Every structure is written in structure tokens, then in C-alpha cells.
């Protein structure tokens, strides 16, 4: 299956940002008033074909964005390689590991949907098993409407404390 045929979670921009009253650029903490309203809107997600959403700024694709902090308090930083899924990000640096979210059939809450997706991405991207990501902490959101990628994506930010030996890069250059 092509990555563009993947069924992903999106939220209508007008619903997510309350007709732009809650729009922001940068990082928004979970306890901020806008952050709380945006979190509430996440439960109104829809499932759409990724290829149809890549150029449609009327929807925001939800992305898990996981910060990995080691036992010394250092945050992982890495360069996005050509083997990664989003060509427009190749060669750029990132402090977040993650990717597109999918529906979780049978999930009891939006919290479960977010966590299951973040844990799946951690396993895929850096080999971090579920039992080693249980200390995952939801921090808030990142958004950047100033570039083509950011106009159609919004990151749900988590922080996970890990041991350096538990993390291994899975992505390679092609």
C-alpha cells in the first residue's frame, strides 16, 4: 500500500481551532486555555486518505511528536533522512519522533487513541517497546502554519524518559 493510501486521523481546522479563535504557531502547553479547547476538539476527528489530505489546509493531520529525554536530561536530536516518509522534511533536524496517527478501533477515549499511536511510532522509529514508554507524558501541541508541511499537520507532543541503551535509529537513508 502506498503511504498516500494510508487512512489517517484528521480534524477539521474550523473545529480544531474554533474558527481560528484558538489558532497558534509554535508550542501550546496543555494547561493553556486554548490548549484545553483544542484537546477537547480532538475527539471530533475523522479518518481520511492521507493522499487527499496532504494539500488540504481545511484539515489538520494529527502527528505524534515524542521528545526522548535520557537519564542525563538530554533531549534526542536527529536529522530526518531520505528514508523517512515526508520528503519535504528530509535533511531537517528534529527533536520529535513520531508520525501520522490512525484510528484505534475499540479505543475508549481520545487519550487512548493518542497514546496507542505515539507508542506505535516509538516502536517503529526507535525500537522503544510499549513497556519502556509507559512514563509518556502529554505536554501539549506544536503547530506551524508558515510552511506547506505545517499548514496540514499539527503535532501532539509527548515526553518520554528513556535509557540511552533502549533507543536505536530504525530509519535509514535510501
Tell where the protein language model's regions lie, with residue ranges.
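Intrinsically disordered, charged low-complexity linkers and terminal tails
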Residues: 1-38
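Active-site segment of metal-dependent pyrophosphate-handling enzymes
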Residues: 3-13, 52, 62, 81-83, ...
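Acidic, metal-coordinating catalytic segment for phosphate/diphosphate chemistry
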Residues: 24-74, 80-84
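Short connector loops at helix/strand junctions that flank enzyme active sites
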Residues: 59-63, 70, 90-96, 153
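Generic beta-strand structural signal
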Residues: 64-65, 73, 93, 116, ...
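Conserved Nudix-box catalytic region and its N-terminal flanking loop in Nudix hydrolases
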Residues: 74-120
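NUDIX/MutT-family hydrolases
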Residues: 167-174
Amino acid at each position: 500500500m502506498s503511504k498516500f493510501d494510508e487512512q489517517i486521523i484528521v480534524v477539521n481546522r474550523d473545529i480544531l481551532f474554533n474558527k481560528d479563535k484558538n489558532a497558534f504557531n509554535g508550542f501550546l502547553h496543555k494547561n493553556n486555555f486554548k490548549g484545553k479547547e483544542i484537546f477537547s476538539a480532538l475527539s471530533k476527528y475523522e479518518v481520511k486518505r492521507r493522499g487527499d489530505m496532504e494539500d488540504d489546509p481545511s484539515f489538520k493531520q494529527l502527528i505524534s511528536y515524542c521528545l526522548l529525554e535520557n537519564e542525563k536530561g538530554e533531549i534526542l536530536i536527529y536529522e530526518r533522512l531520505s528514508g523517512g516518509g515526508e520528503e519535504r522534511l528530509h535533511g531537517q533536524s528534529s527533536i520529535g519522533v513520531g508520525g501520522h496517527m490512525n484510528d484505534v478501533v475499540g479505543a475508549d477515549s481520545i487519550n487512548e487513541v493518542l497514546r496507542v499511536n505515539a507508542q506505535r511510532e516509538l516502536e517503529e522509529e526507535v525500537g522503544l517497546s510499549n513497556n519502556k514508554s509507559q512514563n509518556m507524558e502529554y505536554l501539549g501541541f506544536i503547530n506551524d502554519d508558515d510552511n506547506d508541511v505545517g499548514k496540514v499537520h499539527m503535532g501532539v507532543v509527548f515526553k518520554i524518559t528513556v535509557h540511552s541503551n533502549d533507543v536505536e535509529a530504525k530509519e535509514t537513508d535510501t
